[in-house]
Amino acid sequence: MRRLLLNCAVTASLAAPLQAQADREADLLRQLSEAETPEAARRVESELDALWSQSGSAAVDLLLKRGQDALEAGDPEAAIGHLTAALDHAPGFAAARVARAAAYYATNRIGPALDDLREALLLNPNHTEALTGFAVLLEEMGREEGALELFRRVQAMDPQDEAVAEAVRRLAVRLEGTAL
């Protein structure tokens, strides 16, 4: 009996931080959808990015940061190396998959980019950057209906994102015609 109670206590102590993170994510996504200005939306996006960039391992978080820094410095090959190392240790880390997809895209490796975005969305279906990246790739591949659907989904989540709004307008006109 004592062992059962100990197991329950350990399980509860491990589940509490996960629930707190899920609650925080839900609150931030609500704030993002209700943001009244682009500036407010960007602040919430930054908080979401910070939340999603926490793997639970300082070493994996450092590899993510190094990968992002390498990508920003114009070295996508180094980024792929760092991010692949992060994913070797934490294959369920959606933020690392999204970042590696961007690095693959920068090196014209569209197949691996799509694979990483697909996996990221299975792990975190609310990841706006993954949704947007997938929509961009679909549009580039001529799959405009799918791209429009994803852009509209992102627009519902982040109505202040002007680039997404422009993509929705552009694709809607092309696919649905102009409104009278």
Language model features: what each stretch is:
Residues 1-4:
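Positively charged n-region of N-terminal signal peptides that target proteins for export
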Residues 7-15:
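Bacterial N-terminal signal peptides
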Residues 57-129:
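Alpha-helical adaptor scaffolds
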Residues 18-65:
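N-terminal leader/linker segments that initiate helical-solenoid repeat arrays
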Residues 72, 106, 140-141, 173-177:
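Register position in tetratricopeptide repeats
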Residues 34, 43-44, 50-54, 149, ...:
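Terminal, low-structured helical/coil segments at or just beyond the last alpha-helical repeat
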